Amino acid sequence: MSLALSYPHDPATGSPQPLPAEALWAVAAQLRAVVARDGSPWALSTHALVAAVAQLQVNGRRIASAWEFGQRVHDASGHEVLGVFETDPSTPGLALVSVNRQLIGDRPDLELSTVAHEVGHIVFDAPPSVTEPTRRYRSVTAGPNCLDGASARAERRANEFMGALLVPPRPLHLRLVARARSEGLPMVHAPHRGRPGSRVLPASTQPDALAGLTAALAGDFGVSDRFIAVRLRRYRLIAGDGR
């Protein structure tokens, strides 16, 4: 049975309406809830995530995905890239994803982030191919910097979805509070986007203490320290540091 996801969209084309971050987080939560866990209550795995999106219904449109991990992947200029997402007019409703394991190397965190980013494209950019069978779409993930610093709307959307899928606001806040308490670190009341009623780190948190917390949280969620740092900012879990 395929997972059904929904979000505001153009009913004629299937294209997403402009979605605020919180709406993207909500869609990510729908998907995360059904991804099987491989021994961790916090971290997702590449295998489980790919399996979860094999068949989807997105706003009533059936989307299948086919994944390739064994080949090198290049952009239109011939440069090697981390991943490519495509739809093809000959196979409407099928998302074609290639992930370059040779380029990723021994970085399971980078592979997971790349896969989650491409899942964002499946969820938001594949549905129009169902009702527009002549439409071809191609998105390239050139390198790690694309996973937290994109400019195009579709890439920013895929990145925000990826962030909330792998490291959601409330679970991250819960782990942050637990780890800060275990280290005896102070916390303060401040506006945030995480777990209601919980405190956040003060802006005065020492850099070495913050680095240690960030590394521990990265281990909890199976992502990089940089990934966690971005999510802490996005969820405003450090007082005065939200964007």
Write out the residue ranges for each language-model feature.
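Active-site hotspot residues in diverse enzymes, especially metal/ion-binding acidic/histidine motifs
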Residues: 1-243
